[in-house]
Amino acid sequence: MYHSFNIAVIIPCYNEQKAIAKVINDFKTNIPTASIYVFDNNSTDSTAQVAEDAGATVHSVPLKGKGNVVRRMFSDVDADIYLMVDGDDTYDASSAPEMINHLIKNQLDMVVGCRQENGDQNTYRKGHR
């Protein structure tokens, strides 16, 4: 259903070199028609290079803070549908097509996903409940 839409997966990042390639590849697998954008916020590791090597379009955001990055993402990327995910592999990319189809089918402005509580201590990091 979503294949005729311009979909952008936008990923704010700071020091996510260990997880970013998996995140990019998972979303490329689950939404093959989407464009993947990584917005690096002054990482001191190789996040930007790893993301580029994985096939993402990488933007550098020099102003510190996730708020600055989010504003830049929505300003710099033109798409019909935006899917914003974190670069630390905490969201299941296989849920994305269902969420996008739900958005389109029901003519919604926004759909918000959330990790499910499953008893796993790693579901939510401390301070993220």
UniProtKB/Swiss-Prot annotation:
Pfam families named in the record: Glycos_transf_2
Swiss-Prot/TrEMBL keywords: Glycosyltransferase, Lipopolysaccharide biosynthesis, Transferase
Pathway(s) per entry: Bacterial outer membrane biogenesis; lipopolysaccharide biosynthesis
An MF annotation (GO) of this entry: glycosyltransferase activity
UniProt keyword Transcription present: no
GO biological process, one term: lipopolysaccharide biosynthetic process
Keyword Transferase recorded: yes
Gene3D superfamilies documented for this protein: Spore Coat Polysaccharide Biosynthesis Protein SpsA, Chain A (3.90.550.10)
Family, similarity comment: Belongs to the glycosyltransferase 2 family.
Stated name of the protein: Protein RfbJ
Organism: Shigella flexneri
